[in-house]
Amino acid sequence: MFNVTKKSIEWGGETLTLETGKVARQADGSVIATLGETSVMANVTFAKAAKPGQDFFPLTVHYQERYYAAGKVPGGFFKREARPSEKETLTSRLIDRPIRPLFVDGFKNEVLLIVTVLSHDLVNEPDIVAMIAASAALTISGVPFMGPIGAARVGFAGGEYVLNPDVDDMQKLRENPEQRLDLVIAGTKDAVMMVESEAYELSEAEMLGAVKFGHEAMQPVIDMIIDFAEEAAHEPFDFSPPDYAALYAKVKSLGETQMRAAFAIREKQDRVNAIDAARAAIKAQLSEAELADENLGTAFKKLESSILRGDIINGGARIDGRDTKTVRPIISETSVLPRTHGSALFTRGETQALVVTTLGTGEDEQIIDALHGNSRSNFLLHYNFPPYSVGEVGRFGPPGRREIGHGKLAWRALQAVLPAATDFPYTIRVVSEITESNGSSSMASVCGGSLSMMDAGVPLKAPVAGVAMGLILEDDGKWAVLTDILGDEDHLGDMDFKVAGTENGITSLQMDIKVAGITPEIMEQALAQAKDGRMHILGEMSKALSSANSFSAYAPKIETLTIPTDKIREVIGSGGKVIREIVETSGAKVDINDDGVIKIASNDQAAIKKAYDMIWSIVAEPEEGQIYTGKVVKLVDFGAFVNFFGKRDGLVHVSQIANKRLTHPNEVLKEGQEVKVKLLGFDERGKVRLGMKMVDQETGQEIQPEKKEKEEAGEA
């Protein structure tokens, strides 16, 4: 009944297995990949014909994590998986980016790739396994896919590269100074296709070394998929790339001159309008059959690409007049919004980001529910890209995959320089509103985010800047690396290479490559140019702000104290009674962690002090010999019970009340009276012994021996 194909190798200290032929047999390609005890299933289906008139490649990738994979039940009212989490969205993009360029040019049939996590051992991250499963499923499906690809995760600990560090290592990346890198790489046997990384100020050489290490480490996986496909692959889909040479030749002859003139215009919107006019002029001269040709859009793109790329490769200027290494003009401003905690407006050429920072308390932290368990994040970065930023009318609504991905890239770039939570106990939310875009808006978010946080008073370890690099690589081997690319250079170029970091090193690197043939020499040149660009941008940013400002008057103030964990119950009280009383009485917010760290927040410093004192009176131990203010709560024949130091009671013996003989305490005291008492010690049962006669009841100071003797003599 089943025709099972199964292959296994030892890889990175674990067994990697690929299996097909038993599950999801009606899919065009189905593979279950297992690393350790983490199993991921990838299923590929594709349409056998393109939709009429379709001029793009409709590839859809869905990565989904099932809670049962880790033995968990989903939260929420319905107790089932719902909309994709941020992790699922980011992993979908991680799979999509390296495979999309490897489909044969001209293939426009719809392709659907669904990747599902079936089992998670809480050791091996499922994203790498998912990419391997997806690659294998595509390779055996028969779809015109020029893979396979491999994938690997690279860490950097103790000066050594580490293959596929486990979940715990990556979760503790920020707290562990030895573990300084989380890099995911995907590529074919001969070329790197995609890099995504989070780093802690690594040098360009260290980052390049990590890419080389990862590409070499994935080779056994690629060889395994090839061997696997030789036994399990379906018949290749009969597809021949469309021949549109005649159509392209006609488009070029009709409109190359006008199109070149359009690309010579330096302002983006004027250039876009001129390009649209050139296209319209060409279309006006084409026949109905040529206008209906689904390859017309491809012919236009080829013409535009040849103009932009040819001018750069042949030593001419870029479309905005710059050479290959120049960064566009930069203007940085801070404190642009009066009531926010921190704000910055970062403008680089025709790309602009308005970035706002808000400081919150512990209750504002984001709770992340993942397969490996719940966690909390005190740093949030949200990126918004409205249609008006590119002068268009378009969809407006919740953030899409692109916005989530760009926001996470900026998050990775900035989180490496955040102060430790123990030093800066705030939740930080950064929002980047892209108000203009002509390339590299995510890197503008990094620059604006750094300035905005410093404007809010966040003591960053160092300012961070980012720059997007591009590449033009021709078939004859000529190439050019471009600094600070425009939108058209990204669209028509061969590489999008984003690098962010401080003066000391790289904090984030993202690379997407559309062609094979990217050599280590090209990558080294791109990193060197990116460093020069980053240093220039940091210099321009420092003109606006070079270090953290003082706190905004509108930001909450936070103080922390640490109490013994066995005292947490006393501070909370039965059913939360005590903590509610503290909050209501003081007016401050109080957040208690399981480790005994308490954060007290308010805009009013007096409220913070009130809450602090109330908590301290509960958890602190009274010290022998110290003087405290108390209240008489009960009088008995042998003395007075006094409540002091919060909820504590002690006995003042009748002989310790006054410097004279008393027959009953009510001769000098009454219930409810405020008194000053000295803690004399503890009896054999641990009961508190207090004294009054050695304390001046007016000043609260201890009576000196000579004064005491005079008082006793006077009484005699």
From Swiss-Prot:
What is the protein name given in its UniProt record?
Polyribonucleotide nucleotidyltransferase
What keywords sit in the KW lines?
A: Cytoplasm, Magnesium, Metal-binding, Nucleotidyltransferase, RNA-binding, Transferase
Question: Residues in domain S1 motif?
Answer: 625-693
Q: Does the keyword Ion transport apply?
A: no
Q: Which compartments does it reside in?
A: Cytoplasm
Pfam families, per database record? KH_1 (PF00013), PNPase (PF03726), RNase_PH (PF01138), RNase_PH_C (PF03725), S1 (PF00575)
Has keyword Aminoacyl-tRNA synthetase?
Answer: no
Q: Which cofactor does it need?
A: Mg(2+)
Q: What cellular component terms from Gene Ontology apply here?
A: cytosol
The gene from which this protein is expressed is pnp
